[in-house]
């Protein structure tokens, strides 16, 4: 599919806005619930800063994940989906990790093929 106007998301939003909105709400609810659980566990494990606002961070994460799929902002010719995901996760994690979390992240990055 080339361009946003031919994408299934665009077509759904244009022709079936109520269904699109309901699907987006379900996606948001599912994803933020999962992210909140992960953030809470990360704080408990002292990998994420205890001062983070878990609700806010989960919403920012969702918004970023939706945003990196915008082909107008991130053309596929310039940004591969894998590169976008990797860069976004690195950006997100560096904003919330503790010193111990950073050590773990750095060791993961070094061992990644």
Regions found by a protein language model. Give the residues of each.
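C-terminal alpha-helix
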Residues: 38, 91-95
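Hydrophobic/aromatic-rich alpha-helical bundle segments in the mid-to-C-terminal region
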Residues: 43, 47-90, 99-113
């Amino acid at each position: 599919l080339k361009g946003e106007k031919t994408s299934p998301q665009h077509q759904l939003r244009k022709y079936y806005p109520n269904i699109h909105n309901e699907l987006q709400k379900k996606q948001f609810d599912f994803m933020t619930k999962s992210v909140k659980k992960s953030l809470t566990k990360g704080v408990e494990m002292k990998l994420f800063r205890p001062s983070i606002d878990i609700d806010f961070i989960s919403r920012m994460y969702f918004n970023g994940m939706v945003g990196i799929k915008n082909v107008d902002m991130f053309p596929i010719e310039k940004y591969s989906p894998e590169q976008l995901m990797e860069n976004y996760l690195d950006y997100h994690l560096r904003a919330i990790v503790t010193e111990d979390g950073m050590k773990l992240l750095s060791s993961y990055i070094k061992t990644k093929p």
